[in-house]
Amino acid sequence: MIKRVHLGQGRADEILDLPNLIEIQLNSYEKFLQLDKLKNKKPLLNEGLESVFRNIFPIKSGNGDVALEYERYYIENDTLNFTEKECKRKGQSYEAVLKVRLNLQFLTTGEIRQKDVYMGTIPLMTERGTFIINGAERVIVSQIHRSPGVVFYKEKDLYSARIIPYRGSWLEFEIDSKKDYLYVKIDRKKRILITLFLRALGFDTREKIIETFYNIKKIKVEEGTKRDLPGQYLAKSINIRENMYYRAGDKITLQDVEDFLQNGVNEIELVDFDGYNDVSGKYFVSSNVILNCLEKEDAFFALKDGSKELPKESVMLAVYGALFPGEPISIDNAENDLKTIFFSERRYDLGRVGRYKLSKKFGSDDLSTSVLTMDDIVNTISHLLRIYEGHDILDDIDHLGNRRVRSVGELLTNIYKGAMSRVEKIAKDRMSNKEVFNLKPQELISVKPIVSAVKEFFATSQLSQFMDQVNPLAELTHKRRLNALGPGGLSRDRAGFEVRDVHYTHYGRMCPIETPEGPNIGLIVSLATYSRVNDYGFLETPYRKVVNGEVTNELEYLSAIDEEKKCIAQANAAFNSDGKYLEDLVSVRISGDYTTTNPKNIDYMDVSPRQLISVSSALIPFLEHNDANRALMGSNMQRQAVPLLFPKPPIVGTGMESVVAKDSGVVVKAKRSGEVILATSNKIVVKPFESENVKDLDEYHIVKYERTNQDTCFNQSVLVKEGQKVERGEIIADGPATRYGELALGNNLLLGVIPWNGFNYEDAILISDRIVKEDLYTSIHIKEFSIEVRETKLGPEKVTGDIPNVSEKILNKLDENGIIRIGTYVKPGDILVGKVTPKSEGDITPEFRLLTSIFGEKAKDVKNNSLKVPHGTEGTVIDVQRITKEDVGNLSPGVEEILKVYVAKKRKLKEGDKMAGRHGNKGVVAKILPVEDMPYLADGTPLDICLNPLGVPSRMNIGQLMESQLGLAGKYLSESYNVPVFESATNEQIQEKLKKAGFNPTSKEILYDGYTGEPFENEVMVGVIYMLKLHHLVDDKMHARSTGPYSLVSQQPLGGKAQFGGQRLGEMEVWALEAYGAAHTLQELLTVKSDDMSGRVKIYENIVKGVPTNVSGIPESFNVLMQELRGLGLDLSIYDDNGNQVPLTEKEEELINKS
């Protein structure tokens, strides 16, 4: 391991170690499958797969005679056909068989038939948090979506409340502030007046509705109060006699008061608008919205004042008609239907989270009811009205209390839920159809829906992604990603600015820096370093508790909901050894506000300064001195760094390098403490101390030169020697882009910040030849080429070295089976696997047919269908795989075997390759200069790299300068530094180190010109900077074409490297040539070099024969235009100067010749 010096303003030790960085994946999947708990036969009943089976079973037949009951499920580990390594080599999925023990119970006879039923296979997660599907490693990205529960928000003049369930119908309330009416919508259908909805749910009288929402006051009716009563609303109906009936909710007039007095009504109950807060625990409202709705009912049903209440039929007709327009209605059914929509567990499920959110919002303790209750509906309406009146505040939809994370386990649970409900339906059908008493449990269960749903999810879901495997950091970040897109999430086009923006609740939960540039900005984010997902799916972050102004070592994880209104101090607030703050005013944050306060008011304190950013951002030293946009680019570009052959860890690190290497899964860690008894290049054997058994050894297999998903090279190298003692968890072998157990994405280079003859203009980079010679930026890239050998209708294809019409020189590289030999250097066009296919009858000439009929089969010809090296690829063949049906058991139909050839290429750094630092300072190598021509220091040391000083001021990434200064000191003092993010080294500390190393405190030195030996006019800033080579290599982009494929309709060359296309000559280029009057150049570009078919062939012949050429025909695009005009019904023909018709197609030519 490297010894690092801690250099910064904070303490070297952290109060809380970083968690396992991929635990979000591992924990979620373990919760789903519960493998550890299955061993003890005690799975949690309401988690994952167990909960799915418990909810679906028992399945009962329609008549109730037969029931299919569930006992338990188990995973058959011995059914793993292949290990992880074999799955990758053979293109298989790493999965195990899922079996469920079912009891088929005949309730009439009491007989029980038990059987373990096959339920398909289930992909298993590797210990690195990935899945292997069809031979490729994939990651299931966590999705961040709107949490179930209730949300209150305002759009234009509408105040709305939405109750969003986990599964079921959405319920939406809205107040139209212009008209003061409250409506309800179910599943975004037609809106219904709230009072009608309440009546349909059982609040069938006006009195019930009023006493639910309003405080009621009793008032004596006497001469003294007579003047105050008119204009107030009755809360209880008053029935004096037949034609004197006063309804609750009606406004009192002066005449009414007189009637009361005359008829001996001494006391009446009125709506008390002002007393909305008088009763504790009750949330009454103070506006007359509900009363307006009652009034509107009268208008809606044209009631006469005399009639007392709305008949139930009218209410049901109105509500049901809006919900299910055009369906026939029976009142009892309508009532049942309405109840089942919200109150039946089969149709509606708030989920644990939805219930938790509702209880939290309305202050109830109920955490178990999964359906809506009448209280929920009443509370929601009251709360919405109180917001409308200004007594409560709206919700913030982008608050992390209203967004939650669904990880692998939950996504898979939902897939299984959907599949199992189809299985249930099929089972019920089979129970009713067949002779039930002859049935076995396995005959009732159809596995198809499960198998296809799981396959579809892993293979095609938007959240199941091909793992980004460029380097260990890319792998790790991919597993910690949160995606707002995908099924049930947002879509790119509809996501507005607010959803994408940074929110104050992201602090310590989601990284404000790391997100892609482009259309997905803010929709795909990264988990912060200490963040974790709680049982409800909300993101939590740890804090230290502060009690009475004293910091304790007690930790508490808070979700965004818990953190609201809490007073939180920063991690670097100064306090003494007793935990007392040193200053009287400490800077804190409360919700979204930043302020200072007395230590007594503080509730919590941050755990670490790097708590609020992600792993990638935490790898950037001096991050706080960079502009946020550049920090974003720096975080994203570290993920694109190619693993090098000889990387070095950075001199200036942040302390995160070893954590990333350890958790990424690319290094080998010792499982138990022990002594190394064998260490070869591909195997380590450790004898554990704890075990007495001589045969109990830990074996570790070292991966050598394997291809990753992105064609980079995965190679591990051993770090231990035989006889060495190792501790548990110690790193015993490095992986790609790691050195001595630390992440090493690039190399440290001696830098001069100086323009050099215009070669580093506009972010270009000038580099010394030493870097290429010493292979500092050489990387290995491995490509896979595969070919299938099929059974065709004319006979099988054959792999053979006997290929027609191929030169001996090319065939020499193949072995006796017609496969390229391992170790051969191949170039474009070389054959990797010789394969011949039987020719179809149509390909055969008449002469050949005659021979076949005379000599039988012998003369049948074959066609060369070999696998060749594509353009732009060369390298050494390092491996050949042959996969046959015997190996795998099932290849796709018609395929006899698959051959894969792996070609590796060493790529040195060259002009056109993209390089970058860790601060978003990216550029393209413009020139590689001989060492002797590079500027050099006073002691003769030539620079490795020259960057343009103009790249710094406008970009505001000063971190690169501070890193270079400290790096220079570190190089000459032979030290490596840990400079933690947000508490990095001060200028004084850096200058101290520079002086110690014998440099100017400004790190500006006199440089000499390599050409002349003269010193440059001004001193130049010199430093040591950490540079990476990115996965944008010039070899992958460079492309040339002479002749190649043409588009079918327009007959113009295709575009793009993948199609081996040509260079586009667009209208602007044509204008430029026209402006120069280059008529002949233009003519040949637009005809023979593009789409004049006959001209192309002729000119090629003439060039081959060496004849001067001047060919011009009709370009195909003209023919296309002609045919399009004919398609419009215009009869067009072309004639030459002599009046002869020019044929456009072969058919026309025949017609003209005939006539």
Swiss-Prot record:
Presence of the UniProt keyword Transferase in the record: yes
Keywords, in A-Z order: DNA-directed RNA polymerase, Nucleotidyltransferase, Transcription, Transferase
Gene3D superfamilies: 2.40.50.100, 2.40.50.150, 3.90.1100.10, DNA-directed RNA polymerase, beta subunit, external 1 domain, DNA-directed RNA polymerase, subunit 2, domain 6, RNA polymerase alpha subunit dimerisation domain, RNA polymerase Rpb2, domain 2
GO MF, one example: ribonucleoside binding
Top-level EC class: transferase
Family annotation (Pfam families): RNA_pol_Rpb2_1, RNA_pol_Rpb2_2, RNA_pol_Rpb2_3, RNA_pol_Rpb2_45, RNA_pol_Rpb2_6, RNA_pol_Rpb2_7
UniProt cross-references to InterPro entries, sorted A to Z: DNA-dir_RNA_pol_bsu_ext_1_sf, DNA-dir_RNA_pol_bsu_external_1, DNA-dir_RNA_pol_su2, DNA-dir_RNAP_su2_dom, DNA-dir_RNAP_su2_hyb_sf, RNA_pol_bsu_bac, RNA_pol_bsu_CS, RNA_pol_bsu_protrusion
Quaternary organization: The RNAP catalytic core consists of 2 alpha, 1 beta, 1 beta' and 1 omega subunit. When a sigma factor is associated with the core the holoenzyme is formed, which can initiate transcription.
Name by which UniProt lists this protein: DNA-directed RNA polymerase subunit beta
